[in-house]
């Protein structure tokens, strides 16, 4: 099977993700509530119910690229028990999965394969970039390593670390669940562009900046 990587056109309308069109819009349900209160509230309840089921039944696609995958698999053991978050059903086929975790170093030769696997996943689908190598290439600032998977995939959650601990992966799942709960997707089957609404997620660094800057007494390494 031949794999091809979709090239980015710097002069194009959507130069970052050629396969998707992204724009900043208001929450469509807020507009619906002002038009018809009853139908707006009903649609809001239906979205909440569907999103509740989606965020508590995430099916990850089982594949890994490097050492970060070992930490990801560790979270599936009884010690961490990722089943508490409804994400223990690993799928061997991208057509049965809705979460892709890019765990490890993404080489240039592997990028078209990852992109093809992402295209085979059905909506709704999400992407987690796990580890420094997947986020920005890590220490491999060379021609053969992609400097961040967000160069060719839309990433929902980034996990820092080299490699991140299983607890970091579980926190990323919780952040993804929070984001899924705020999504607005068509409640019926749609062919073509689904017009998905996703709320902006504030980075943890910005969200916890005030709390961290207020700390005056730092813990010793033995207390961490």
From Swiss-Prot:
It is an enzyme of class 7 (translocase). One of its GO terms (cellular component) is plasma membrane. Binds 1 [4Fe-4S] cluster. Its cofactor is [4Fe-4S] cluster. It is a peripheral membrane protein. Its main location: membrane. GO terms for molecular function: 4 iron, 4 sulfur cluster binding; iron ion binding; NADH dehydrogenase (ubiquinone) activity; NADH:ubiquinone reductase (non-electrogenic) activity; quinone binding. It catalyses: a quinone + NADH + 5 H(+)(in) = a quinol + NAD(+) + 4 H(+)(out). Keywords: 4Fe-4S, Cell inner membrane, Cell membrane, Iron, Iron-sulfur, Membrane, Metal-binding, NAD, Quinone, Translocase, Transport, Ubiquinone. It is found in: Cell inner membrane. Its EC number is 7.1.1.-. It holds the Pfam family Oxidored_q6. [4Fe-4S] cluster binds at residues 67-68, 133, 162. It comes from the Bacteria. NDH-1 shuttles electrons from NADH, via FMN and iron-sulfur (Fe-S) centers, to quinones in the respiratory chain. The immediate electron acceptor for the enzyme in this species is believed to be ubiquinone. Couples the redox reaction to proton translocation (for every two electrons transferred, four hydrogen ions are translocated across the cytoplasmic membrane), and thus conserves the redox energy in a proton gradient. PANTHER family: NADH DEHYDROGENASE (PTHR11995), NADH DEHYDROGENASE [UBIQUINONE] IRON-SULFUR PROTEIN 7, MITOCHONDRIAL (PTHR11995:SF14). Belongs to the complex I 20 kDa subunit family. HAMAP family: NDH1_NuoB. This is NADH-quinone oxidoreductase subunit B.
